[in-house]
UniProtKB/Swiss-Prot annotation:
Can bind to LGI1 and LGI4. Residues 729-766 form the EGF-like domain. The chain crosses the membrane at residues 790-810. Disulfide bonds join C405-C488, C447-C472, C449-C456, C557-C577, C733-C748, C742-C754, C756-C765. Residues 811-829 are cytoplasmic. This is Disintegrin and metalloproteinase domain-containing protein 23. Residues 56-283 form a propeptide. Residues 296-493 form the Peptidase M12B domain. It comes from Mus musculus (Mouse).
Length: 829
């Protein structure tokens, strides 16, 4: 039985029926209807009229009341929006079910911005929602208020949303691209009206809204998620009383997921016993933070296709704002749960025509878009297309699994829809880029996603508005990072697109430190974005949180996650750890059994275990030599049409992957066909030579030996060919006179630079540079008095003794004189 609110695989990208607009008991079908009956529309308009009639704009003393919107105009606009919604609903009705419809409620509301008036101490509602700052003559673009508050009345409750501009959304190099007469037109910057915040008085609430042309976005408390957007876009952002539609759905109880984590493991999901690791721990003095705990930055570029541009009234400004609104929502999800900020570096809009074929086949679109992405000049960790197309596919997005940081595989294609729905779809496809799998229903009990009405983001049930990753998804991301993936995510932006603002978590011009809204640095070290007197740093793995001083050079700040990674050490002059680098492709690893490739140690054993579980292993060499040369289903180097391609003897270890101890189903991907069990009696024992075609969503068959896997002495696989490592034409690091890379005192990184052992320096690591003080000085306790203090004390003591002696002598001499001249004081002789 499906949980309430779940739908069949595909997330819903359009609106749903209004509870208040039912056609009466017994008159409407239980499920979605092809189109709403006219009485339902009229009832919605009647519900809207009282709100419009009673709306008023707070005015200063003596100001005239503004005229209310004409109800006929508003009703006409509302009916037009609903008609469009009906058409879309009819097209997508197959993606819905009755339980979801009953779990969603909608209302019309008139939100207002809270402002202060002269001689007033409290906020008052103001029905102009625009957040542009006044007096902007010195700016060449609209600048929005750093903070704003909005009041929304809906579902019998009043919500006050306190917002702060999300200045971490756009990079300092953010650019917008569109086309005119076949040429690319670039514009730096753009309007930034994207906010994060909370519901006033509600603990652990979250808000992500944009204020360009009305309110677009979501907010949530412990019970419900609310989506809001204007009924219609307008060019007059100063208009009053703009009706918005607000939708309410049940929210999950995510906090419970992180409690009572299961420690039961299984062969199929060997990572589950490690879930206890996900518990939050109190910060100790300079804890050793792993790659998951460290904040990461995914630099994203969005491309909008031509139909998306047409949908937004052929306005590239509106289209760009839509993309930024979606990424603002995604950023709020990722930073909260994955310790990853999603930073928008560019938005490209195809204003004249599509630059690839837009088809209903997402696999073909993904391959075509990957080729297009390689022509894009802008730097990005991932590039994703938003297309107004309906895929003939079980999901609404597709991306390359684990492809982030790759110019070829760091891409995805996503269906267009309402902002919240597109945000979920984009969250899913980006998660695939980050090595997070889809979760079939069979995994749900182990992953303990207990959303009360649906499920978590990566569930295959197609929940429409989930904002939570399950603990399995979080663990898979951690495992992806631990295997060496995502090395490009650790370059922290140094400045923002918007003007300097204290409190946004980025150190900008005029600031010495910035703790951010979620305090991430040590409070004693940073006050009002200035370092405390005597402090050198305020945050980072290389900042001592008690002394506020840099850790000494050679202090380990980021552990190597595997034998192909490079341990990073503090430099002694920064609080931040150096960039996350790994060894150059071709280094040996795993006791010379594997080769490093893209930061991972590639062996056939590792690949078999990743696909089939911890008990699996690579088959004997005899299996590869015998089967892969035959060119059959049991062994081959690929397929040409209907013909299996035999491997040459030179390439047998780069063909079909043959393993032992396969499980019934793979840990990743889907079986294409069946497992092909094969065994031989060889050298007095039976050897297992089984294989299978395991296909990912992006059509990649991981049933073949991976690129980078060793296939002979100083040789590795590439495109199912066994090649000399020297033939890969990789940039080399400096060699010394003996031919040793980095003088034998360092390793060559993926950037073709020498990373020296911390007692050596120079571009070739040939300069000895011993660490003078590798460990911080130990506290020796209270020190004794200095020699100067002893001398001063001795002198003072001597003077005091002399004074006492002289004083006593004088007193005694005086008494003697008295006894000598006073006859009455004389005693007998």
């Amino acid at each position: 039985m499906k949980p309430p609110g779940s739908i069949s695989r595909r997330p819903t990208l359009t609106g749903c029926s209004l509870p208040g607009a039912s056609c009466g008991p017994g008159r409407c079908p239980a499920g979605p209807v092809p189109a709403r009956a006219p009485p339902c529309r009229l009832l919605l308009v009647l519900l809207l009229l009282p709100a419009l009639a009673t709306s008023s704009r707070p005015r200063a003393r003596g100001a005239a009341a503004p005229s209310a919107p004409h109800w006929n105009e508003t009703a006409e606009k509302t009916l037009g929006v609903l008609a469009d919604e009906d058409n879309t609903l009819q097209q997508n009705s197959s993606s819905r079910n009755t339980s979801y419809s009953s779990a969603v409620q909608k209302e019309i509301t008139l939100p207002s911005r809270l402002v202060y008036y002269i001689n007033q101490d409290s906020e008052s509602p103001y029905h102009v929602l625009d957040t542009k700052a006044r007096h902007q003559q010195k700016h060449n673009k609209a600048v929005h208020l750093a903070q704003a508050s909005f009041q929304i009345e809906a579902f019998g409750s009043k919500f006050i949303l306190d917002l702060t501009l999300n200045n971490g959304l756009l990079s300092s190099d953010y650019v917008e691209i569109h086309y005119e007469d076949g040429k690319q037109m670039y514009s730096k910057g753009g309007e930034h009206c994207y906010y994060h915040g909370s519901i006033r008085g509600v603990k652990d609430s979250r808000v992500a809204l944009s204020t360009c042309n009305g309110l677009h976005g979501m907010f949530e408390d412990d019970t419900f998620v609310y989506m809001i957007e204007p009924l219609e876009l307008t060019d007059d952002e100063k208009s009053t009383g703009r009706p918005h539609i607000i939708q309410k759905t049940l929210a999950g109880q995510y906090s419970k997921q992180m409690k009572n984590l299961s420690t039961d493991g299984s062969d199929q999901w060997p990572l589950l016993p490690e879930l206890q690791w996900l518990r939050r721990r109190k910060r100790a003095v300079n804890p050793s933070r792993g790659v998951f705990e460290e904040m990461k930055y995914l630099e994203l570029m969005i491309v909008n296709d031509h139909k998306t541009y047409k949908k937004h009234r052929s306005s590239h400004a509106h289209t760009n704002n839509f993309a930024k609104s979606v990424v603002n929502l995604v950023d709020s999800i990722y930073k909260e749960q994955l310790n990853t900020r999603v930073v928008l570096v560019a938005v490209e809009t195809w204003t004249e025509k599509d630059h690839i074929d837009i088809t209903i086949n997402p696999v073909q679109m993904l391959h075509d878009f990957s080729k297009y992405r390689q022509r894009i000049k802008q730097h990005a960790d991932a590039v994703h297309l938003i297309s107004r197309v309906t895929f003939h596919y079980k999901r609404s997005s597709l991306s390359y699994f684990g492809g982030v940081c790759s110019r070829i595989r760091g891409v995805g294609v996503n269906e267009y829809g309402l902002p919240m729905a597109v945000a979920q779809v984009l969250s899913q496809s980006l998660a695939q880029n980050l090595g997070i799998q889809w979760e079939p229903s069979s995994r749900k009990p182990k992953c303990e996603c207990i959303e009360s009405w649906g499920g978590c983001i990566m569930e295959e049930t197609g929940v429409s508005h989930s904002r939570k990753f399950s603990k399995c998804s979080i663990l898979e991301y951690r495992d992806f990072l631990q295997r060496g993936g995502g090395a490009c995510l650790f370059n922290r932006p140094t400045k923002l697109f918007e003007p300097t603002e204290c409190g946004n978590g980025y150190v900008e011009a005029g600031e010495e430190c910035d703790c951010g809204f979620h305090v991430e640095c040590y409070g004693v070290c940073c006050k009002k974005c200035s370092l405390s007197n005597g402090a050198h740093c305020s945050d980072g793995p290389c900042c001592n949180n008690t002394s506020c001083l840099f850790q000494s050079r050679g202090y380990e700040c980021r552990d190597a996650v595997n034998s192909c990674d490079i341990t990073e050490y503090c430099t002694g002059d920064s609080g931040q750890c150096p960039p996350n680098l790994h060894k150059q492709d071709g280094y040996s690893c795993n006791q010379n059994q594997g080769r490093c490739y893209n930061g991972e140690c590639k062996t056939r054993d590792n690949q078999c275990q990743y696909i089939w579980g911890t008990k699996a292993a690579g088959s004997d060499k005899f299996c590869y030599e015998k089967l892969n040369t035959e060119g059959t289903e049991k062994g081959n180097c690929g397929k040409d049409g209907d013909r299996w391609i035999p491997c040459s003897k030179h390439d047998v270890f780069c063909g079909f992957l043959l393993c032992t101890n396969l499980t019934r189903a793979p840990r990743i991907g889907q079986l294409q066909g069946e497992i092909i069990p094969t065994s031989f009696y060889h050298q007095g024992r039976v050897i297992d030579c089984s294989g299978a075609h395991v296909v990912l969503d992006d059509d990649t068959d991981v049933g073949y030996v991976e690129d980078g896997t060793p296939c002979g002495p100083s040789m590795m696989c590439l495109d199912r060919k066994c090649l000399q490592i020297q033939a890969l034409n990789m940039s080399s690091c400096p060699l010394d006179s003996r031919g040793k890379v980095c003088s034998g005192h360092g390793v060559c990184s993926n950037e073709a630079t020498c990373i020296c052992d911390f007692t050596w320096a120079g571009t070739d690591c040939s300069i000895r540079d011993p660490v003078r003080n590798p460990n911080p000085p130990k506290d020796e306790g209270p020190k004794g008095p200095s020699a100067t203090n002893l001398i001063i004390g001795s002198i003072a003591g001597a003077i005091l003794v002399a004074a006492i002696v002289l004083g006593g002598t004088g007193w005694g001499f005086k008494n003697v004189k008295k006894r000598r001249f006073d006859p009455t004081q004389q005693g007998p002789i």
